[in-house]
């Protein structure tokens, strides 16, 4: 019966006294070991950060090489140039800067007007067509 109880409880009977507030085993070197462990963790973290910084520097050097090769600008540089252009446009203005009109937005309306005018001219008599084309 005792064997079954030990197996069921496992090693919990040893820890029961500690959980109930009993005396804990005091290791004289426990503080020293903990300090060594903390120092080892700190060193490992510093090594990891140094390795990461080195890898990131290598990646950035490779990215910059690709940017130089293909003439690509960094996102921050493009945003800074766009911001400078917006500020230059709005220096004398009292209102907020207008958004840039995408190419082709205003051109389509003029082309449609011309095509409508051309279709109207086609239906006019010859002398009126000559007079309007001039």
Swiss-Prot record:
InterPro entries: Synaphin. One of its GO terms (cellular component) is terminal bouton. Keywords: Cell projection, Coiled coil, Cytoplasm, Exocytosis, Neurotransmitter transport, Synapse, Transport. Residues 15-81 have a biased composition (Basic and acidic residues). Residues 1-113 are annotated as: Disordered. Residues 48-70 are annotated as: Interaction with the SNARE complex. It is found in: Cytoplasm, Cytosol; Perikaryon; Presynapse. GO terms for biological process: regulation of neurotransmitter secretion; synaptic vesicle exocytosis. Signal peptide: none annotated. Transmembrane segments: none annotated. It comes from the Eukaryota. Residues 29-69 form a coiled coil. GO terms for molecular function: syntaxin binding. Pfam families: Synaphin. Its main location: cytoplasm. Belongs to the complexin/synaphin family. Positively regulates a late step in synaptic vesicle exocytosis. Organizes the SNAREs into a cross-linked zigzag topology that, when interposed between the vesicle and plasma membranes, is incompatible with fusion, thereby preventing SNAREs from releasing neurotransmitters until an action potential arrives at the synapse. Also involved in glucose-induced secretion of insulin by pancreatic beta-cells. Binds to the SNARE core complex containing SNAP25, VAMP2 and STX1A. This is Complexin-1. It comes from Macaca fascicularis.
């Amino acid at each position: 019966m005792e064997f079954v109880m030990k197996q069921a409880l496992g090693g919990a009977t040893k820890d029961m006294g500690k959980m109930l507030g009993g005396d804990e085993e005091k290791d004289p070197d426990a503080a020293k070991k903990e300090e060594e462990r903390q120092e080892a963790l700190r060193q490992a973290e510093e090594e990891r950060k140094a390795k990461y910084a080195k890898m990131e520097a290598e990646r950035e050097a490779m990215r910059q090489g690709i940017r130089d090769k293909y003439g690509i600008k960094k996102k921050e540089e493009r945003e800074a140039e766009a911001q400078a252009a917006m500020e230059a446009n709005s220096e004398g203005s009292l209102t907020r800067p207008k958004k840039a009109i995408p190419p082709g937005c205003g051109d389509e309306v003029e082309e449609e007007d011309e095509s409508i005018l051309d279709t109207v001219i086609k239906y006019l008599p010859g002398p009126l067509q000559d007079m309007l084309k001039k």
